[in-house]
UniProtKB/Swiss-Prot annotation:
<dbReference type="GO" id="GO:0038180">
    <property type="term" value="P:nerve growth factor signaling pathway"/>
</dbReference>
<keyword id="KW-0165">Cleavage on pair of basic residues</keyword>
<feature type="propeptide">
    <location>
        <begin position="4"/>
        <end position="119"/>
    </location>
</feature>
<dbReference type="GO" id="GO:0030425">
    <property type="term" value="C:dendrite"/>
</dbReference>
<dbReference type="GO" id="GO:0005615">
    <property type="term" value="C:extracellular space"/>
</dbReference>
<dbReference type="InterPro" id="IPR045815">
    <property type="entry name" value="NTF3_N"/>
</dbReference>
<dbReference type="GO" id="GO:0008021">
    <property type="term" value="C:synaptic vesicle"/>
</dbReference>
<dbReference type="Pfam" id="PF00243">
    <property type="entry name" value="NGF"/>
</dbReference>
<feature type="glycosylation site" description="N-linked (GlcNAc...) asparagine">
    <location>
        <position position="112"/>
    </location>
</feature>
<protein>
    <recommendedName>
        <fullName>Neurotrophin-3</fullName>
    </recommendedName>
</protein>
<dbReference type="GO" id="GO:0021675">
    <property type="term" value="P:nerve development"/>
</dbReference>
<dbReference type="GO" id="GO:0005163">
    <property type="term" value="F:nerve growth factor receptor binding"/>
</dbReference>
<dbReference type="GO" id="GO:0043524">
    <property type="term" value="P:negative regulation of neuron apoptotic process"/>
</dbReference>
<dbReference type="InterPro" id="IPR002072">
    <property type="entry name" value="Nerve_growth_factor-rel"/>
</dbReference>
<dbReference type="GO" id="GO:0050804">
    <property type="term" value="P:modulation of chemical synaptic transmission"/>
</dbReference>
<feature type="region of interest" description="Disordered">
    <location>
        <begin position="32"/>
        <end position="61"/>
    </location>
</feature>
<keyword id="KW-0339">Growth factor</keyword>
Amino acid sequence: IQSTSMDQGSLSEDSMNSFIRTFIQAGIWKNKVPKQAARTKDGTQTTAKKTEAEPEATANKDFQLGFQPVVSVDAELLRQQRRFSSPRVLLSENTPLEPPPLYLMEEPMVLNRTSRRKRFAEGKSHRGEYSVCDSESRWVTDKSSAVDIRGHQVTVLGEIRMGPS
């Protein structure tokens, strides 16, 4: 079942949110059922075997990369919510062939589309090569007055006392 266009007309934001909540809850419930079956009769959890721990390690690695495995969803749930369709969301019974591109997860600006993107210089390694004036950074210990960034004459303190005098 695939839904890629808004052929049913525009939907309110509340109805779309309720559909997404139902969709997520159904997926979460399906993932929790096998974990509950791993408990013994007296109510204590059994220790996981190595074969069961390996898929969890793979899932943790996928989670760290930002890729979450697709949760299987009943076709019945999709049929019930058929009136909800979106041009940005593809509902399908097939799993994706590959994880989402990593460049989308590396840049935090992609997640916040309302903020403007910061401009960078063409070649970062050439920054400052054609500067207007040269600057020197060194400690000056024998000055008693100086000019601040606004052009005002200021007194340079020889020592700064901190704490109670």
